[in-house]
């Protein structure tokens, strides 16, 4: 989970893990749906999207413009591993584009990709294997 100016971004991998009754505050939470494993049923995701609208929760799809437009999501999340420059004419202009970056090079790429909000991660030293660098507070 990341926080940005009193907004909270929750990463989920399937629509069954979130209990909407636990979210009491409106217009502060955003869900980023990343489908890494088994693909979900579109009708189930549409129901999940509808619940997000009812609770005033922002709904973003990770790295999938087609799914983003099918579900009429609030926006697109571009992960740090996505290096492709987006063509804004290819999708609805009202979509918010957010992204994540792990270093200054990726930060520049996210700006080129049109991200309005960039989640800058790994600010502090961690003990993760193969991830020894950290940025510090910028």
Regions found by a protein language model. Give the residues of each.
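Conserved N-terminal beta1-alpha1 strand-loop-helix module at the mouth
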Residues: 1-84, 90-116
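Active-site/ligand-binding-proximal alpha/beta "capping" segment
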Residues: 113-138
